[in-house]
Amino acid sequence: MNDKFTTASFLESKKQGRKITMLTAYDYPTAKILDEAGVDSILVGDSLGMVVLGYEDTTRVTMDDMVHHTKAVVRGVKRAMVVADMPFLSYHTGKNDSVRNAGRLVSEGGCKAVKLEGGEDIIENVKAIISAGIPVVGHLGYTPQSINVFGGHKAQGKTIDTAKKIYRDALLLQKAGVFAVVLECVPYKLAAFISKRLDIPTIGIGSGPDCDGQVLVIHDLTGMFKDFTPKHVKKYAEIGETVSTAVKSYIDEVKNGVFPTEKNSFKVDDWIIDELDKVRFDI
C-alpha cells in the first residue's frame, strides 16, 4: 500500500486482473482522505464546475480553475496517482495549445497525467501531448463537455453506428499511446467487449462491472447532494444529511446559548480584567 501508483501500475493491474479504483477530489482535505484510504488514483475532474463551482455543466471550467484545484489535490496525496482533466476547448485548437495546456497541469498543477474527452477528432493532439512526455487518459462514451451536442446526459453506444465509433476510437487512442481510457455511460456489454479487446485498462463510470476499474464523483458516492443521484451511482454515505444536521444543531445551540461553553474558550487571570476596568483611554 505504500508504493506509489503509476502509469505502470495501471497496466500491471490490467495484466494481473486487479480492479483499479479511482475517485474525484478537488481540494486538499478530500484528497488526503482518499489517499490515506488507499484509492489507486485521484481524478481532478472538470466536474468541479458543477459540484464545487455551481455551474450547470462542465463547459465553463477554465484552465486556471483546473490548475488551482489540481495544486490543492496534489498537496494532499502521497501514494495515489493524480490525473487532471483538460477543460473544454483547452485541447481543441491545435497541437501547440494542447501541449501548452497539458504542460500547465503537470508543471504548475503537479499532476502525473491528464485526461481528454474524444477520439479520432482529437487524436493528433493526444499524440502531441504524449510526445511531449505527458501521460494521457482517454475518455469515451458520454463525454460531458459535449453535453450540448448530445442534448443532455445520455448513454452512448446503443446503436450499431455509435457502438462502432466508441470501439474504433478506443483502438485509436490505444494506438496513440494513452495508458487508460474512461468509458462513461456505455452499455455494459459494449464496455465488456471493449475491455477484453484492449491491452490498456478501461475505467468505467456507469458502464458496468467488467471494466478494469471504476471511477465515481466523490460528492455522489458520499451523498453530498440530496436533489439528484445519477443512475450509475451507489451512495456509500449520506454526508449531505449529516452536515445539514450538524449545522442545524450548531445554529440551535448558538441561538440558545448552549455553545460555546468555558470548555470551548480561553482563560485569562481575573486581575487582568480588573485592571482593564480601571483603564481610561483618551479616544
UniProtKB/Swiss-Prot annotation:
Mg(2+) binds at residues 46, 85, 117. Disulfide bonds: none annotated. The active site is at 184 (proton acceptor). GO terms for cellular component: cytoplasm. Pathway: Cofactor biosynthesis; (R)-pantothenate biosynthesis; (R)-pantoate from 3-methyl-2-oxobutanoate: step 1/2. 3-methyl-2-oxobutanoate binds at residues 46-47, 85, 115. It catalyses: 3-methyl-2-oxobutanoate + (6R)-5,10-methylene-5,6,7,8-tetrahydrofolate + H2O = 2-dehydropantoate + (6S)-5,6,7,8-tetrahydrofolate. One of its GO terms (biological process) is pantothenate biosynthetic process. Signal peptide: none annotated. InterPro entries: Pantoate_hydroxy_MeTrfase, Pyrv/PenolPyrv_kinase-like_dom, Pyrv_kinase-like_dom_sf. CDD domains: KPHMT-like. GO terms for molecular function: 3-methyl-2-oxobutanoate hydroxymethyltransferase activity; magnesium ion binding. Homodecamer; pentamer of dimers. PANTHER family: 3-METHYL-2-OXOBUTANOATE HYDROXYMETHYLTRANSFERASE. Catalyzes the reversible reaction in which hydroxymethyl group from 5,10-methylenetetrahydrofolate is transferred onto alpha-ketoisovalerate to form ketopantoate. NCBIfam families: panB (TIGR00222), PRK00311.1 (NF001452). This is 3-methyl-2-oxobutanoate hydroxymethyltransferase. It comes from Acetivibrio thermocellus (strain ATCC 27405 / DSM 1237 / JCM 9322 / NBRC 103400 / NCIMB 10682 / NRRL B-4536 / VPI 7372).
